[in-house]
Structures are given as C-alpha cells and as structure tokens.
Amino acid sequence: MVEAGDFRRGLTIEYDGQIFQVIEFLHVKPGKGAAFVRTKLKNIKTGAVIEKTFRPDERMPLAHIERREMQYLYNDGELYYFMDTQTYEQIALNQEMVGDALKFVKENMTVTVLSHNGVVFGVEPPRFVELEVIDTEPGFKGDTQTGATKPAKVETGAVIQVPLFINVGDKIKIDTSTEEYLSRV
C-alpha cells in the first residue's frame, strides 16, 4: 500500500480494479481547506489518461510490475524492436507504449521493459546516458556568465539545455529522468 502523498512519476497502483501508472502529480496546499494531490494516471491496458484528485492520506495498493532488461535494437518507422539478452527473445512495441522513453536512447543500449501479468505497457530508459552533441551554437570567449545555457541537439535528435562551453563533438552525460545536462565526459 502507498499513500497518495508518496506518489512519484512512474509509480504503478491499482485503482478502481485497473492498473494505472502515475504520469504527473502535484501536491496542492490551498490557503483554506485540506491539502490534496492532483494526479494524471495512465491506464496501462487501454492507454487512456485520467485526472484524479486524492487526499494525501488515501492508501492505494501497489501493482506488481515485472521489469526485464532488454536491448533496444531498431525502429522500422512504426514499431520499436527489443531483445532479451538472456533468452534472445524479441518483442516489438508501438510508439504509444514507448512514448518519450527512447528520447535519449541509441540503438543497442539497454533499457528496462515494464509488464504486468505478461502484458508489456512501457519502457524505462537507463538513468544516465552519454551522448555526443551534434549541433549547438558556438561558445564565445568571455561567455562566463554563471548558469547561462544554450540549446544543444544530441545524436538521438533530442534537444537539451547545456552550459555555454559545450561544443559540437563533445560527449555529455544526461540524467534521463530530469532531461538535464550533468557533465562533460
């Protein structure tokens, strides 16, 4: 059991006899009245997204989720193909199931495939990835303003904010959960 006040992104719960994954949550403490948690929940079977408000002390049962490490092979335009590195079994998932999970994932990287009772419903990227910057504005001598950033496109096509000293060809480390630059590699 988990309290609504402890919700976080990616958590899977049982609600109304269905399995839902928490996509977004917001703890709200109004000036008048009791606090509440506003959430967006995705039904893992249908893909439907609902908005629901809970009291922070409401308790929900956690759904048991199976996690399998799989290698991302390729995308054929419609489907994304993954292979279990232990059994060499391959599965294909559509864009809806994958979502933005592969935003920072290159072919042959290892990802976690999520399933419930044998039904695959999502993909989790590795927490940290190292990618090469393929396009960004050049930094100029004297760009020393603290905290200044610029957009940079990495080899997977995703765009993130990086410090001014990062140039094309640099390898950078990215936190995929926050989509933020961490360091130069």
Swiss-Prot record:
GO molecular function: translation elongation factor activity
PROSITE patterns, per database record: EFP (PS01275)
Annotated InterPro entries: Elong-fact-P_C, NA-bd_OB-fold, Rib_uL2_dom2, Transl_elong_fac_P/YeiP, Transl_elong_KOW-like, Transl_elong_P/YeiP_cen, Transl_elong_P/YeiP_CS, Transl_elongation_fac_P
Key words of the record: Cytoplasm, Elongation factor, Protein biosynthesis
CDD domains: S1_EF-P_repeat_1, S1_EF-P_repeat_2
Protein location: Cytoplasm
Single GO BP term: peptide biosynthetic process
Function as written in the Swiss-Prot or TrEMBL entry: Involved in peptide bond synthesis. Stimulates efficient translation and peptide-bond synthesis on native or reconstituted 70S ribosomes in vitro. Probably functions indirectly by altering the affinity of the ribosome for aminoacyl-tRNA, thus increasing their reactivity as acceptors for peptidyl transferase.
UniProt similarity note: Belongs to the elongation factor P family.
Protein name from the UniProt record: Elongation factor P
Native organism: Caldicellulosiruptor bescii (strain ATCC BAA-1888 / DSM 6725 / KCTC 15123 / Z-1320) (Anaerocellum thermophilum)
Lineage: Bacteria, Bacillati, Bacillota, Bacillota incertae sedis, Caldicellulosiruptorales
